[in-house]
Amino acid sequence: GEVDGRPMYKSMAEAGEPADLALILVNKKAALAAVTDCAVHGVKVGVMYTAGFGEMGEEGARIQQEMVRVANEHGMRLVGPNCMGVFSHPAGLNLTGEEIPSGDIALISQSGNIGFSLWYDAANYLHTGFSRFVGFGNQADIAVHEYIDYCADDPMSKVIVIYLEGLRPGSGLDFIRSASAAAKKKPVVILKGGRSTAGKRAASSHT
């Protein structure tokens, strides 16, 4: 079939040519198959919106690890899962489903709802906006320090704002190095959520 004159395919295999980016919005049971289909057929980056993996227990964590393994085996990187998408004002790209005010702030947020709140406040109270946004969720593959490195070298981003609930195991030193290096180039603001016991429980869903 078609949508607005553009062809639709049931899979990347059916499409017949690779894509730079895939948005993966399927139920949890179909997620691994979707990642495999994309990775095997040359997709460079997948944005996994689907939740219910590492934040939901051992079985979810196992599936999450397998998705990352399959993706990386074929040279594909994965944003998320359990994420709210990405936004790039310079590229004219908005994969969040929300209207984001443009400006020169790079926002890296583990929580989608916190990201939405910051967009609203920036537009309505500070009269500013964003150059880049990523809601990175579980950071199963691409960790927060990698987003920081990108934004640190991005001439369109004058300030980096990070909302962080937790780091991927083993990535603490990388985070410190990246944040410290970025702070030598531009202001870096970090808001740490999930400090209390109740906050940690709420933060585990990244919503």
Which residues make up each language-model segment?
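Catalytic-core regions of core metabolic enzymes
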Residues: 1-207
